[in-house]
Curated annotation (Swiss-Prot):
Record's subunit section: Heterotetramer of two alpha chains and two beta chains.
Residues where N6-succinyllysine is found: 8, 12, 17, 41
Modified residues (N6-acetyllysine): 17
The gene coding this protein: HBA
Annotated organism of origin: Piliocolobus badius (Western red colobus)
Family indicated by similarity: Belongs to the globin family.
Protein function: Involved in oxygen transport from the lung to the various peripheral tissues.
MF-aspect GO terms: haptoglobin binding; heme binding; iron ion binding; organic acid binding; oxygen binding; oxygen carrier activity; peroxidase activity
Residues that bind O2: 59
Protein name: Hemoglobin subunit alpha
Pfam families membership: Globin
GO CC annotations, alphabetized: blood microparticle; haptoglobin-hemoglobin complex; hemoglobin complex
GO biological process: hydrogen peroxide catabolic process
InterPro entries: Globin (IPR000971), Globin-like_sf (IPR009050), Globin/Proto (IPR012292), Hemoglobin_a-typ (IPR002338), Hemoglobin_oxygen_transport (IPR050056), Hemoglobin_pi (IPR002339)
Amino acid sequence: MVLSPADKTNVKTAWGKVGGHGGEYGAEALERMFLSFPTTKTYFPHFDLSHGSAQVKGHGKKVADALTLAAAHVDDMPSALSALSDLHAHKLRVDPVNFKLLSHCLLVTLAAHHPAEFTPAVHASLDKFLASVSTVLTSKYR
């Protein structure tokens, strides 16, 4: 999915507001996903999935850091996320639908924390951005 210049600006501005809360928001989005879509828990059999778990917080930070990297390299996400794409395709073998589920939960989390800034235009831009990240992460599945 091609991001317009306005989309790129919206993504960088919105993700910039996440600031030091990336790990917190990532963990919250994961918790939302586990509660709303319980089948996603199967990819984390070794995790303590309880609220506030250090493992969920740690993985939430990894998710946020990957999205920060993608936002910083929005014009070349395939190169920036290549190692992560390899990991998910060849080692973790995550079902691609799970990226869509997590993306939805990330949007809900961002909207809950930044309602004034979460305009329809920002929502659409973030949705396109997350769809692009998902496409990159699943590009090596073949």
